[in-house]
Amino acid sequence: MDADKIVFKVNNQVVSLKPEIIVDQYEYKYPAIKDLKKPSITLGKAPDLNKAYKSVLSGLNAAKLDPDDVCSYLAAAMQFFEGTCPEDWTSYGILIARKGDKITPDSLVEIKRTGVEGNWALTGGMELTRDPTVPEHASLVGLLLSLYRLSKISGQNTGNYKTNIADRIEQIFETAPFIKIVEHHTLMTTHKMCANWSTIPNFRFLAGTYDMFFSRIEHLYSAIRVGTVVTAYEDCSGLVSFTGFIKQINLTAREAILYFFHKNFEEEIRRMFEPGQETAVPHSYFIHFRSLGLSGKSPYSSNAVGHVFNLIHFVGCYMGQVRSLNATVIAACAPHEMSVLGGYLGEEFFGKGTFERRFFRDEKELQEYETAELTKTDAALADDGTVNSDDEDYFSGETRSPEAVYARIMMNGGRLKRSHIRRYVSVSSNHQARPNSFAEFLNKTYTSDS
């Protein structure tokens, strides 16, 4: 018997077939570099930096930026940001720099140049007559890279969120060591003319390169990261959420995964912990793999590990975390089942802790405590395990163990308890729910049951 087939009759004729549905056609690509070559892009001819500065600044003022010219300028301006490498820097077997080396952002990558001239038009009226200073170059680089951050802010953010961010960024780049080079609100006005620039591969690459550099190298102009920080772990919301989750519940990754009681987690956990990746290596190319073009479709995004993502944020909702209530539900990844498991895990880790004495007045007190604890352990091991109290949680031993939680779920038939539903409704009803958020899902799903 083929387990995938169904049998039925059509006009008295027996039909046997295998139902097939549309599947995810995209290949998840891991970012490991196997050819020992630095990530690279190709740009037009390197410009005269003074001419390029004047052209790009005039375009910023006129809200008419040429993306090719901007990228060419950003790559050329990397020479202004020299710093000292604090330690030997390697990633995926590539030696980026030795300890003590003088490096600039373009030491991290390979930027190839063609002979094609840029436009370098002056679209913003008056031309700057003198040559720009380094602080002026740094301010222009910072403002241009901030267009990346602004273009990554989703439309779901309410009110004047994006405008407020743009205003704060402008304030940074008009304060020493930077210098004011544009009028107030210029950044937001220009952003509206290039709102999708985060999708331009070369611009994204340069933003990631600057961010990777300034995240490691101490530098006078490190505040440039304000516009590029969103390239770190970009499209890794699944992995980032899991990392935050295990810190929140104070377990190791291995201990936390033992609570994932659902077959749909198997493929996602395998995908998320593929061997050979530098997920735990500081300052690795891995952190910026998306912007550096090392992977077309991230295996670590919320969509790639949707069941894990949903579970983590249902637990977060149970604990009243605003970030989880605002996160977007992955509708195709069993949100109803994940909300049930999330309720049980939320109850398990909410308002409870495992505590023990760790600090003592002197060594004598420490030894006395350890002796007393050993005596308790010996007594527990000698116990025959007979259940003699209604308060015991189904069996003797660690009630917070995966076995204990699984037993409670089974005893309740895989359904949420009333107390779980009340908690879900309580946290979600007091929150202004965004469309398709976890708060909205919980409100719509459980309000009538509370």
UniProtKB/Swiss-Prot annotation:
Positions of post-translational Phosphoserine modification: S389
Molecular-function GO terms, alphabetical: RNA binding
Record localization: Virion; Host cytoplasm
Key words of the record: Capsid protein, Helical capsid protein, Host cytoplasm, Phosphoprotein, Ribonucleoprotein, RNA-binding, Superantigen, Viral nucleoprotein, Virion
Family note: Belongs to the lyssavirus nucleocapsid protein family.
UniProt function note: Encapsidates the genome in a ratio of one protein N per nine ribonucleotides, protecting it from nucleases. If expressed without protein P it binds non-specifically RNA and therefore can bind it's own mRNA. Interaction with protein P abolishes any non-specific RNA binding, and prevents phosphorylation. The soluble N-P complex encapsidates specifically the genomic RNA, with protein N protecting the genome like a pearl necklace. The encapsidated genomic RNA is termed the nucleocapsid (NC) and serves as template for viral transcription and replication.
Protein name: Nucleoprotein
Organism: Rabies virus (isolate Skunk/Ontario/1991)
